[in-house]
Curated annotation (Swiss-Prot):
It is found in: Cytoplasm. S-adenosyl-L-methionine binds at residues 96-97, 168. Keywords: Cytoplasm, Methyltransferase, rRNA processing, S-adenosyl-L-methionine, Transferase. It comes from Neisseria gonorrhoeae. Belongs to the methyltransferase superfamily. RsmJ family. It holds the Pfam family SAM_MT. InterPro entries: 16SrRNA_methylTrfase_J, SAM-dependent_MTases_sf. Its main location: cytoplasm. The keyword Signal does not apply. This is Ribosomal RNA small subunit methyltransferase J. Its EC number is 2.1.1.242. It comes from the Bacteria.
Length: 250
C-alpha cells in the first residue's frame, strides 16, 4: 500500500476524498520510494529525493491544449465517436484518454485498480468538476476503483454491455519530452507490474458490444500476441481494434 502524508493545509474536500482509498497515513515522508502528498486542494505523487511531482490536472497544460486546440482525432476514429458509443476505459491510469473521450461528448466509465493512482485521478476529476471550462467533460467520467477484469462482468449484469472497451496497457515511453519521461518513470515505479494482458483482453472481448480498442506504440507488439481485426495508425501511436467474441468483421 502507498503512504500518504497529509499536510495541515489539506482542505476538508481532499481529506474526505483520500478516505475512500486504502492508503497509509504517515507523519513524514518515507526514507525512499514514492508517496502521496495531500496539501491545500491537491493530491500529488512525490518521489523521495526529487523536487518535481505528478498531479492530475485537466484544466491546464497538455489537457487544456487538447481540449481547446483539438487533438484526439485518431482515438475518435478508433472508437467511432460519431455514433456516440458508451465507453469503458479498463486501464484509466492518470485519466488522459478518459478525459479526451469525455471531451468528445462520450460517457466514460473508468477503472483503475491501484489505490494511489485512483486517488490521484479522483482528485483530478474533483477539481475539474469545480472549473466551469471542464465541469461538463468531467461529469461524463465515472470512476470505479478496482480491477477492471474482475469488475466488468458484474457491472454488465446491472448496466448492460458498453459499446466500447478501451485498453491502454503500460508500455515503455519513447520519443517523449523529459517531463513526460519523468512523470511516466514515477508512474511505472509506483504501479509496478501491469495487469495480465491475456485476461484483460479476453474479458474486454467478452464485455464489449461493438469493439475493443487497444492503444499501442506505432511499432509495438500486439497485445497478448493477438492480431487485431484492423488498425488506426498515427505518427507515434496506433489503435488496434478487436471484435467481441462471435462478432463478424466490419
Amino acid at each position: 500500500m502507498t503512504d500518504i502524508l497529509i499536510d495541515d493545509t489539506a482542505t476538508e474536500a481532499v481529506r474526505t476524498l483520500i478516505r475512500a482509498f486504502p492508503l497509509v497515513p504517515v507523519s513524514q515522508p518515507p526514507e525512499q520510494g514514492s508517496y502521496l502528498l495531500a496539501e491545500h486542494d491537491t493530491v500529488s505523487l512525490r518521489l523521495v529525493g526529487e523536487k518535481s511531482n505528478v498531479i492530475v490536472d485537466f484544466t491546464s497544460g497538455a489537457a487544456q491544449y487538447r481540449r481547446t486546440k483539438g487533438g484526439g482525432e485518431l482515438i475518435a476514429k478508433a472508437v467511432n465517436h460519431t455514433a456516440h458509443p458508451t465507453v469503458w476505459d479498463a486501464t484509466a491510469g492518470l485519466g488522459r484518454d478518459s478525459f479526451v473521450l469525455a471531451s468528445l461528448g462520450l460517457t466514460v466509465t473508468a477503472f483503475e485498480q491501484h489505490p494511489a493512482v485512483a486517488c490521484l485521478l479522483s482528485d483530478g476529476i474533483r477539481r475539474a468538476l469545480l472549473n466551469p471550462e471542464t465541469q461538463d467533460t468531467a461529469a461524463r467520467i465515472n470512476l470505479h476503483f478496482g480491477n477492471a477484469a474482475e469488475q466488468m462482468p458484474a457491472l454488465v449484469k446491472t448496466q448492460g454491455k458498453p459499446d466500447i472497451v478501451y485498453l491502454d496497457p503500460m508500455y515503455p515511453e519513447r520519443r517523449k519530452s523529459a517531463a513526460v519521461k519523468k512523470e511516466m518513470a514515477y508512474f511505472h515505479r509506483l504501479v509496478g507490474e501491469a495487469q495480465d494482458e491475456v485476461v484483460l483482453l479476453h474479458t474486454a472481448r467478452q464485455t464489449a458490444k461493438k469493439r475493443v480498442v487497444v492503444k499501442r506504440p506505432r511499432l509495438g507488439e500486439h497485445l497478448a500476441g493477438q492480431a487485431p481485426a484492423y488498425q488506426y495508425t498515427g505518427k507515434s501511436t496506433r489503435f488496434d481494434v478487436y471484435l467481441p467474441y462471435g462478432a463478424d468483421k466490419g
